[in-house]
Curated annotation (Swiss-Prot):
UniProt GO MF annotations: NADH dehydrogenase (ubiquinone) activity
Protein name per UniProt: NADH-ubiquinone oxidoreductase chain 5
Chain ranges passing through the membrane: 1-21, 30-50, 72-92, 119-139, 140-160, 177-197, 200-220, 241-261, 274-294, 301-319, 331-351, 365-385, 403-423, 454-474, 505-525, 619-639
Source taxon at top rank: Eukaryota
Similarity comment: family membership: Belongs to the complex I subunit 5 family.
Compartments reported by the entry: Mitochondrion inner membrane
Keyword Transmembrane: yes
GO biological process terms on file: ATP synthesis coupled electron transport; electron transport coupled proton transport
Protein task: Core subunit of the mitochondrial membrane respiratory chain NADH dehydrogenase (Complex I) that is believed to belong to the minimal assembly required for catalysis. Complex I functions in the transfer of electrons from NADH to the respiratory chain. The immediate electron acceptor for the enzyme is believed to be ubiquinone.
Keyword Methyltransferase among UniProt keywords: no
Membrane protein topology class: Multi-pass membrane protein
EC number: 7.1.1.2
Recorded name of the encoding gene: ND5
């Protein structure tokens, strides 16, 4: 059963990719979708067997690298963390496969698309089930390649190609540091196997743990789009909407958070790494929320909300609340996939226009889509008793429950980020569905926007159910005080970092309710201003101050401008100079060009000795004879100098 979870998506990828013409579009869709659905059912059974019974399963297939001091076995382990990650990955993957049947129906490259989707699912399974860092790195690179292939799926569009290259290069920065971290683990511990590394972690130098932790954190920053290496995520929205839902909301972007959770037995032994995680997550949350408020592309707004929620997960990791981070990761996957698929339904209905300022009044045409996007937005803003409420508010409470300066400061910053998250969620819903119609007449009269078929709507309904009930049902499993779900030590919390009881019982009720109170009040204020004081808003936006503020945040804090002007150009200039001086200069001079020129000059000088005069040859013979006689009287040590002198004379 456990091997089937890994192999079935790969079989679907191979059949759809290599035999696509034989099986046809319908055959490729049927094979890939059925394989992923079967894999999802098996993963739910694995979740029950491994998670509830605390019976980790390890499968060793074959020895991959076998040397005197370094051994790697191609093996997989299924513990509580692994099966918990498989649930959102495979459920959302299967729903996205089904959704894509309708969404991509008019595309001529269906087989290639479904092959890429199945390959991505396979690589993600490799990443979360690997039992060592090297095999995990195979899955890590695999999902990066699949992201590149899927973002540039419509390869005739220049923007799609630019975005895919941007995503690939930004992730290479993180991959470079992750590789350095793996080398540091190998150098200090002699192995990359999880069980060996984690059992030896308490006994190594704290500074080594700091270096390893920072390298792993930078790797996670790139993959999970934390501030600094976040530039690729909004650009990756150029791919098809099902790709955005699968990769850039639910699965691949959570790989960095998964890496930090998996490495919890390592990073728990250095509080500096945890403090870096705490502040990095807080800055990312408020940074992305501010940018998201000033975007007009519906998919980019949702992308920035993804970045904000990933910041929340990193905050939870910085608080050593790994189970809360995992719980929020799973909850977020469901409602964020629902938001993306709902946005895809809207885009599909309005002839592929993504600027939500041109929508308006779509509630009458897309009632189901409005309902599911309302559910997903309520879950995103942590409305009471929705799925997101149980995890997001618990992270904020955990920050306050640490009762330290950093904890309270991060609580305030993350609450501000949550307020902005609410504002742009209300903005998207209001301008898309509730405001006056702003679109062209084609949306409403000639070619009215309509709900999609069963393949488009069924995944939305299933994800809406998860977005309402999943958090309530699984709260006690993941973050309950008496839960033994992680009894297999897949997540490790150092006893001095345990704050669960303080979070549950010591945080004042006011600070538990504060995010919700601010969320509701600011939403009401924003709607009131938009509805009744719209002229004031327009005057402010047209003023010099409003123009500058809007431009600064709309241009994403000008970070891309800074990168292009000062970092990218610097690297390109450095590369150009290195090419000019080293590659085309000294290497050519001492290498092929210089060697060839020297040999030609040497041969010309040698050939000039041939003068065709007998007296000259007699002189050469006489000189050689004298040198032979001198050789017997001179020390052997002078011979090299003599030969060198003759060589110089002949080349002049």
């Amino acid at each position: 059963m456990y091997l089937s979870i890994i192999i079935l998506p790969l079989l679907g990828c191979i059949v759809s990719g290599f035999l696509g013409r034989k099986v046809g579009v319908k055959g490729a869709q049927l094979i890939t979708c059925s394989n992923v659905v079967i894999t999802t059912i098996l993963s739910i059974l694995a979740f029950i067997e491994v998670g509830f019974n605390n019976i980790p399963v390890t499968i060793n297939l074959f020895r991959w690298i076998d040397s005197e001091w370094f051994n790697i076995i191609w093996g997989f382990q299924f513990d509580s963390l692994t099966v918990s990650m498989l649930i959102p990955v495979l459920i959302i993957s299967s729903l996205v496969h089904i959704y894509s049947i309708s969404y991509m129906s008019s595309d001529p490259h269906n087989q290639r698309f479904f092959s890429y989707l199945s390959l991505f699912t396979f690589m993600m399974i490799i990443l979360v089930t690997a039992n060592n860092y090297l095999l995990m790195f195979v899955g890590w690179e695999g999902v990066g390649v699949c992201s590149y292939l899927l973002v540039s799926f419509w390869f005739t569009r220049i923007a799609a190609n630019q975005s895919s290259i941007s995503a690939f290069l930004a992730n290479r920065v993180g991959d470079c540091f992750l590789t350095i971290g793996m080398f540091a683990i190998l150098w200090s511990l002699g192995n990359l196997d999880y069980s060996t590394v984690f059992s030896l972690a308490p006994y190594i130098n704290s500074k080594v743990v700091l270096i390893i932790g920072i390298c792993l954190l930078i790797g996670a920053m790139a993959k999970s789009s934390q501030v600094g290496l976040h530039v690729w995520l909004p650009m990756a929205m150029e791919g098809p909407t099902p790709v955005s839902a699968l990769i850039h909301a639910a699965t691949m972007v959570t790989a960095g958070v998964y890496l930090l959770m998996r490495s919890s037995p390592l990073i728990e032994y250095n509080s500096t790494v945890l403090l870096l995680c705490l502040w990095l997550g807080a800055i990312t949350t408020v940074f992305s929320s501010l940018i998201g408020l000033f975007q007009q592309d519906i998919k980019k707004v949702i992308a920035y909300s993804t970045m904000s929620q990933l910041g929340m997960m990193v905050i939870a990791i910085g608080l050593s609340s790994y189970n809360v981070a995992l719980f929020h990761l799973i909850n977020h996957a469901f409602y964020k996939a629902l938001l993306f698929l709902g946005a895809g339904s809207v885009i599909h209905a309005v002839a592929d226009n993504q600027d939500f300022r041109k929508y308006g009044g779509l509630i009458n045409f897309l009632p189901l889509t409005y309902s599911v996007m309302l559910i997903a937005s309520l879950s995103l803003v942590a409305f009471p008793f929705m799925t997101g409420f149980y995890s997001k508010d618990f992270i904020l409470e955990s920050a306050y429950g640490q009762f330290s300066f950093s904890g309270v400061a991060v609580y305030i910053i993350a609450t501000i980020g949550a307020i902005f998250t609410t504002l742009y969620s209300v903005k998207v819903l209001y301008l898309t569905f509730l405001s006056n119609p702003n679109g062209t007449r084609a949306y409403y009269n000639y070619k009215p926007a309509l709900e999609g078929d069963l393949f488009l709507t069924l995944p939305l309904i299933i994800l809406a159910i998860f977005s309402i009930f999943f958090g309530f049902i699984t709260k006690d499993i993941f973050i309950g005080l008496g839960s033994n779900f992680f009894g297999d030590n897949s997540l490790f919390i150092h006893p001095t970092h345990e704050i669960m009881i303080d979070t549950e019982f010591a945080v004042p009720v006011l600070f538990k309710l504060l995010p919700f109170i601010f969320t509701i009040s600011f939403s009401i204020i924003a709607l009131t201003i938009s509805e009744f004081l719209s002229e004031l808003v327009i005057y402010f936006k047209l003023s010099r101050l409003g123009y500058n503020i809007f431009g600064f945040f709309n241009q994403r804090f000008l970070i891309e401008l800074f990168y292009n002007k000062y970092i990218t150009n610097l690297i390109l200039d450095l590369g150009g100079q290195m090419t000019k001086i080293l590659d085309k200069g000294s290497i050519e001079l001492f290498g092929p060009f210089g060697l060839e020129k020297g040999l030609v000059n040497f041969s010309k000088n040698i050939s000039s000795l041939s003068t065709s005069h007998v007296t000259t040859y007699a002189l050469y013979i006489l000189v050689a004879f004298i040198l032979y006689l001198l050789y017997n009287y001179l020390s052997f040590n002078f011979l090299p100098f003599l030969i060198a002198g003759l060589t110089i004379l002949t080349t002049i």
